[in-house]
């Protein structure tokens, strides 16, 4: 049975206390709404998102990554609440999966399990450790009797720990029939989607409660809950990669972005941060190193190294306190204390301590190209744009501002001056 998916993302998110819309808050470097959309499009090609607060800003991010998403706008002034969000929604398929935009931890497999039940109305529920302000679910004889919003619950109902996860699967025709019957006769004067359970019950529709994991279906409302969710996601990310063969030393101290990829046998030491769409292939990343949107293949990086965006390393050693940016290094050794930015360095080249590619003149960035089997002495500055051909020796302390031909020795140092007995003349009278 084909499914249409609707994601509710129109809320103000006031508890987040941020100028950024709640669904654009990030977990592991990806906004909440993008986490949800990735799973939604894996299940259906008919995905809609309901927006209101800062609609244009959220819509821009959604369509950049998922251009096939249908965008709807909720009239919060006249139709507030979760049921109000569904006005104007026209599903293309036989049933609808309704998700919340602030639930980025939900796994695709859990949604597939929810969809595997053929009841006309399925409701995701969980046993809460602390029910807090969740809506309470009353179940009798394996069927949901009703959902009571916390604000409207009596003392007895507040004792119930079976809570509404806010995720529904409903027959499209049933949704179309019941939605106009929902009113706002409640304490908040909102149109609650939870009332659809009561209306379905009145029509003798079987309502199936599907129990799910509380942590996975956690809604995120403030920065504290955001941090809890990110920790949870980090654990899942690292567990997955460890199961694929990656070694993590003290994994609780590392950060791995949601889009990072490991291939082959990799090893990651403590306090490492790997971000963006970085790809690590058969490599070792040593302690306290940072890698941003870079590819590292058959190489070792660190400790205390920094690969800024667009680096490509192959068969290369990057040592401590080396920073690279937009650098392509193939079979290169850069052991310590160097900055290699906007450069291409070829195989067999050794970069001495304190080497700098001076790539910026205050207006533009320029490239340094270094060929094969070049030996670069310590404390060398390359004033880009500059090209060093193969099999060159650059003497320590040189400032290189001209191209160097193949096989040459390049020396450029300030003249030396030594004054005999100067110390005694200055300090001993």
Swiss-Prot record:
Gene3D superfamilies: Hexapeptide repeat proteins, Spore Coat Polysaccharide Biosynthesis Protein SpsA, Chain A. Residues 1-223 are annotated as: Pyrophosphorylase. Coiled coil: none annotated. InterPro entries: Bifunctional_GlmU (IPR005882), GlmU-like (IPR050065), GlmU_C_LbH (IPR038009), Hexapep (IPR001451), MobA-like_NTP_Trfase (IPR025877), Nucleotide-diphossugar_trans (IPR029044), Trimer_LpxA-like_sf (IPR011004). Pathway: Nucleotide-sugar biosynthesis; UDP-N-acetyl-alpha-D-glucosamine biosynthesis; N-acetyl-alpha-D-glucosamine 1-phosphate from alpha-D-glucosamine 6-phosphate (route II): step 2/2; Nucleotide-sugar biosynthesis; UDP-N-acetyl-alpha-D-glucosamine biosynthesis; UDP-N-acetyl-alpha-D-glucosamine from N-acetyl-alpha-D-glucosamine 1-phosphate: step 1/1; Bacterial outer membrane biogenesis; LPS lipid A biosynthesis. Acetyl-CoA binds at residues 359-360, 378, 396, 413. One of its GO terms (biological process) is lipid A biosynthetic process. It catalyses: alpha-D-glucosamine 1-phosphate + acetyl-CoA = N-acetyl-alpha-D-glucosamine 1-phosphate + CoA + H(+); N-acetyl-alpha-D-glucosamine 1-phosphate + UTP + H(+) = UDP-N-acetyl-alpha-D-glucosamine + diphosphate. Binds 1 Mg(2+) ion per subunit. Transmembrane segments: none annotated. Mg(2+) binds at residues 102, 221. It is found in: Cytoplasm. Keywords: Acyltransferase, Cell shape, Cell wall biogenesis/degradation, Cytoplasm, Magnesium, Metal-binding, Multifunctional enzyme, Nucleotidyltransferase, Peptidoglycan synthesis, Repeat, Transferase. GO terms for molecular function: glucosamine-1-phosphate N-acetyltransferase activity; magnesium ion binding; UDP-N-acetylglucosamine diphosphorylase activity. The active site is at 336 (proton acceptor). Its main location: cytoplasm. Pfam families: Hexapep, NTP_transf_3. Homotrimer. PANTHER family: BIFUNCTIONAL PROTEIN GLMU (PTHR43584:SF3), NUCLEOTIDYL TRANSFERASE (PTHR43584). Catalyzes the last two sequential reactions in the de novo biosynthetic pathway for UDP-N-acetylglucosamine (UDP-GlcNAc). The C-terminal domain catalyzes the transfer of acetyl group from acetyl coenzyme A to glucosamine-1-phosphate (GlcN-1-P) to produce N-acetylglucosamine-1-phosphate (GlcNAc-1-P), which is converted into UDP-GlcNAc by the transfer of uridine 5-monophosphate (from uridine 5-triphosphate), a reaction catalyzed by the N-terminal domain. This is Bifunctional protein GlmU.
């Amino acid at each position: 049975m084909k499914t249409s998916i609707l994601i509710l993302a129109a809320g103000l998110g006031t508890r987040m206390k941020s100028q950024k819309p709640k669904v654009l808050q990030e977990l592991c470097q990806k906004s909440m709404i993008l986490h949800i959309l990735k799973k939604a499009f894996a299940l259906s090609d008919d995905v809609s998102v309901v927006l209101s607060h800062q609609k244009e800003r959220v819509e821009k991010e959604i369509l950049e990554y998922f251009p096939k998403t249908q965008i709807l706008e909720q009239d919060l002034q006249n139709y507030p609440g979760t049921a109000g969000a569904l006005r104007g929604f026209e599903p293309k398929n036989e049933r609808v999966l309704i998700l919340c935009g602030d639930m980025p931890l939900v796994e695709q497999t859990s949604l597939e399990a929810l969809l595997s039940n053929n009841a006309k109305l399925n409701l995701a529920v969980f046993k809460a450790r602390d029910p807090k302000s969740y809506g309470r679910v009353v179940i009798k004889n394996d069927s949901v009797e009703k959902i009571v919003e916390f604000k409207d619950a009596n003392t007895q109902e507040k004792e119930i720990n079976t809570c509404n996860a806010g995720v529904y699967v409903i027959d499209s025709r049933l949704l179309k029939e019941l939605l106009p019957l929902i009113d706002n006769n409640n304490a908040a004067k909102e149109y609650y989607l939870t009332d659809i359970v009561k209306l379905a019950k009145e029509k003798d529709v079987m309502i199936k409660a599907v129990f799910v994991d509380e942590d996975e279906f956690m809604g995120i409302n403030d920065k504290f809950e955001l941090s809890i969710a990110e920790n949870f996601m980090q654990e899942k990310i690292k567990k997955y990669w460890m199961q694929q063969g990656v070694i993590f030393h003290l994994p609780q101290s590392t950060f791995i972005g949601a889009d990072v990829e490991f291939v082959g046998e990799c090893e990651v030491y403590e306090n490492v941060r790997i971000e963006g769409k970085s790809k690590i292939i058969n490599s070792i990343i040593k302690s306290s190193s940072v890698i941003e949107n870079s590819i590292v293949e058959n190489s070792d990086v660190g400790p205390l190294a920094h690969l800024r965006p667009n680096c490509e390393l192959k068969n290369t050693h990057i040592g401590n306190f080396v920073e690279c940016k937009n650098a392509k290094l193939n079979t290169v050794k850069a052991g310590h204390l160097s900055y290699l930015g906007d450069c291409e360095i070829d195989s067999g080249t050794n970069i001495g301590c304190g080497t700098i590619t001076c790539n910026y003149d205050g207006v533009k960035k320029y490239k340094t190209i270094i060929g094969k089997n070049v030996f670069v002495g310590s404390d060398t500055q390359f004033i880009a744009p500059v090209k060093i051909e193969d099999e060159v020796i650059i003497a320590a302390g040189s400032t290189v501002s001209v191209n160097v031909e193949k096989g040459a020795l390049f020396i450029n140092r300030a003249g030396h001056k030594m004054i005999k007995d100067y110390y005694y003349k200055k300090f001993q009278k």
